[in-house]
Regions:
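Anion (oxyanion) recognition and catalysis
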Residues: 17, 90-91
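Conserved P-loop
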Residues: 1-65, 104-115, 125-128, 154-177
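Short basic (Lys/Arg) and small-residue
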Residues: 120
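Short, cysteine/histidine-rich loop/knuckle motifs that typically chelate Zn2+
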Residues: 132-135, 166
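Structural recognition of the conserved hydrophobic beta-strand(s) that form the central parallel beta-sheet
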Residues: 94-102
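Conserved P-loop NTPase "ATPase switch" module shared by AAA+ and STAND
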Residues: 64-78
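Short cysteine/histidine-rich zinc-coordinating motifs and their immediately flanking basic loops
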Residues: 142-149, 174-178
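Conserved ATPase-coupling elements of RecA-like P-loop NTPase cores
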Residues: 74-89, 104-110
Length: 178
């Protein structure tokens, strides 16, 4: 959504790792933007990243034992199994960080994000620049150019735009491509 989710998460992740914590960055296998590595929108490569199954993230659990900090990037794309994985990691004393969109472009709850938010000790809601009025830190919603598919795809910047509530609720339906 271009709200700096991955960049902000990377900053928190690296802060923990500086203090001798061993960290791992997990991304869903549906994210195929950069094969074998995780790259943020600002083209920063995330060290120690691993792609895991979006459908069955629990299969990665045994591999996570050596890590102190576990990051789930684009958490909205993981199945509901992510909830039991996060609970298990928390019981093991791990620091768990997740980023993702709360809502689809159709304003439906995105994946299991509402459950993850319920378990969060801290929630940071980031906003993007509205693609209609260009107001900074105002866009909280996404809309797809394809009205028949309201789900935002990972890395699909050409498939969707971000919009602030004011522009989204105006009587005139706006599209930055018009």
């Amino acid at each position: 959504m271009f709200a700096t989710k991955s960049q902000s998460t990377r900053f928190i992740y690296e802060k923990y790792c500086v203090f001798n914590r061993k960290g791992i960055w997990l991304k869903p296998d549906t994210d195929n933007r950069c094969e074998g590595k995780t790259v943020t929108h600002d083209n920063r490569v995330i060290a120690n990243a691993m792609t895991i199954s979006a459908v069955s993230p629990e299969s990665a659990l045994p591999k996570l034992a050596p890590y102190d900090v576990v990051v789930f990037d684009e958490a909205q794309f993981f199945s509901e199994q992510i909830i039991s994985v996060v609970k298990s990691l928390l019981k093991m004393g791990k620091i768990v960080i997740a980023n993702g969109l709360k809502l689809t472009a159709g304003d439906s709850i995105f994946g299991s994000m509402h459950y993850l938010l319920a378990f969060a000790d801290e929630i940071i809601s980031l906003k993007a620049v509205c693609n209609i009025c260009n107001k900074v830190d105002s866009a909280t919603r996404t809309r797809t150019y394809n009205k028949n598919n309201p789900t935002v795809k990972v890395g699909g910047s050409g498939d969707y735009f971000v919009i602030c509530p004011n522009c989204d609720t105006s009587n005139e339906k706006k599209n930055p491509q018009n």
